[in-house]
Amino acid sequence: MVGLTTLFWLGAIGMLVGTLAFAWAGRDAGSGERRYYVTLVGISGIAAVAYVVMALGVGWVPVAERTVFAPRYIDWILTTPLIVYFLGLLAGLDSREFGIVITLNTVVMLAGFAGAMVPGIERYALFGMGAVAFLGLVYYLVGPMTESASQRSSGIKSLYVRLRNLTVILWAIYPFIWLLGPPGVALLTPTVDVALIVYLDLVTKVGFGFIALDAAATLRAEHGESLAGVDTDAPAVAD
């Protein structure tokens, strides 16, 4: 049977492959588009470091009769705002709107981490707090952010909707794994818990990025447009 360490190494390798691919794809990006690639590199790069750390056995924190993998939550606290930031760039959010969605996202992650670290029944109250914040985040992703994205080109809007759907659907699975796994009622073994999380992390980070790269290539080839929504043949404009 595959052990936890092996699963963590698989996650690290997958994230590293994604990081290298995103860095290579963005090597010639114009100034307006560069931040999209930097964000993708940050998402998978941070996750790669977290998985290496866990594979080395660092950050395995005993809580009651379970083990909390602290780097997992630190990874999420750092990378999920970057995913939301990327979506916000596509949607064309202003600074106030960015602040709202990133704050909601951070509350979700902090509540999940705190709940995992609490041995008693109070952890479910923290889980509930995170769930409420998650519903608020979904509302913004599906409502105001989608409306904002509709003001952009059809290609950018289509990419936003694809990435939004991927994010919302797969992120909605994480709370159930938390509840059914070691932090909750422990119906899932640690190995199953880790395997599911590794798979979801790879899809929501590396898969997310590859969808963005594919769409960027299509926009460039068919419309002469970049992720930043400008003509790729036009002079680059500083951010």
UniProtKB/Swiss-Prot annotation:
CDD domains reported for this sequence: 7tm_SRI_SRII
Name listed for the protein in its UniProt record: Sensory rhodopsin-2
Origin superkingdom: Archaea
Subunit structure, as described in the record: Homodimer. Interacts with HTR-II.
Pfam families: Bac_rhodopsin
Species for this entry: Natronomonas pharaonis
PROSITE patterns documented for this protein: BACTERIAL_OPSIN_1, BACTERIAL_OPSIN_RET
CC terms in the record's Gene Ontology section: plasma membrane
GO-annotated molecular function: monoatomic ion channel activity; photoreceptor activity
Membrane topology: Multi-pass membrane protein
Chain ranges on the Cytoplasmic side, renumbered to this chain: 26-33, 92-94, 150-153, 223-239
Role: Photophobic photoreceptor responsible for the negative phototaxis. Activates the sensory rhodopsin II transducer (HTR-II) in response to blue light.
SUPFAM superfamilies: Family A G protein-coupled receptor-like
GO biological process per UniProt: phototransduction
Ranges of the Extracellular topological domain: 1-3, 56-69, 118-121, 182-189
Family label: Belongs to the archaeal/bacterial/fungal opsin family.
Keyword terms of this UniProt record: Cell membrane, Chromophore, Membrane, Photoreceptor protein, Receptor, Retinal protein, Sensory transduction, Transmembrane, Transmembrane helix
